[in-house]
């Protein structure tokens, strides 16, 4: 099993490198998440997401310049009365996503970090920590640009 994961990681990193070259990206951070690998090009404010399913790969780039907010979104299964006496709260957790909201509000992208159907609950603390860390890093990147937009708007208001 470890050998298989190592092969996937090696293949993923090779694919990330090739895609980075193809799209002229230079990654400052990256992370393997199950069948996905994400790479951050902080200088160009782009996040590459590459996913491998059944031997086919699908990749897309999130332009962080167009993102207005990034949050960690958790969804839970329904909890019936008395179930919390038998099971821990985190056992009801269904997914943890990094949610990207765009300035034009036309689109929202959900990047899964934890899915209870495919991920082991023992990995939950690590995956949740990863989601929060990436949310913090990416929010700082878009925060600088949002601050610039706010300054420009204030300048426009002052000149009117």
Segments (PLM) and residue ranges:
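Anionic N-terminal interaction surfaces
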Residues: 1-55
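Generic detection of short hydrophobic beta-strand segments and adjacent strand-loop junctions
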Residues: 31-33, 60-62, 109-111
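Short, surface-exposed coil-to-beta transition loops
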Residues: 33, 57, 93-96
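Residue-level detector of beta-strand structural context in well-folded domains
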Residues: 36-38, 60, 98
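A generic structural motif
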Residues: 41, 68-71
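Short connector loops at helix/strand junctions that flank enzyme active sites
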Residues: 42-44, 62-65, 93-95
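Short coil-to-beta-strand transition motifs
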Residues: 56-68
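Acidic, Ser/Thr- and proline-rich intrinsically disordered linker/docking segments
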Residues: 70-160
């Amino acid at each position: 099993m470890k050998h298989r994961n190592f092969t996937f990681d090696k293949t993923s990193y090779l694919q990330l490198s090739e895609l980075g070259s193809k799209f002229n990206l230079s990654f400052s951070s990256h992370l393997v998440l199950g069948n996905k690998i994400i790479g951050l090009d902080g200088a160009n404010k782009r996040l590459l997401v590459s996913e491998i399913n059944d031997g086919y790969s699908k990749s897309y780039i999130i332009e962080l310049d167009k993102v207005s907010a990034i949050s960690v979104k958790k969804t839970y299964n329904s909890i019936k009365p008395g179930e919390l006496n038998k099971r821990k709260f985190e056992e009801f957790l269904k997914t943890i996503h990094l949610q990207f909201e765009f300035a034009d509000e036309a689109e929202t992208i959900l990047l899964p970090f934890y899915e209870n159907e495919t991920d082991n609950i023992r990995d939950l603390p690590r995956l949740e920590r990863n989601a929060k860390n990436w949310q913090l890093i990416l929010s700082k990147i878009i925060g600088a640009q949002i601050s610039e937009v706010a300054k420009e708007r204030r300048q426009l208001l002052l000149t009117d």
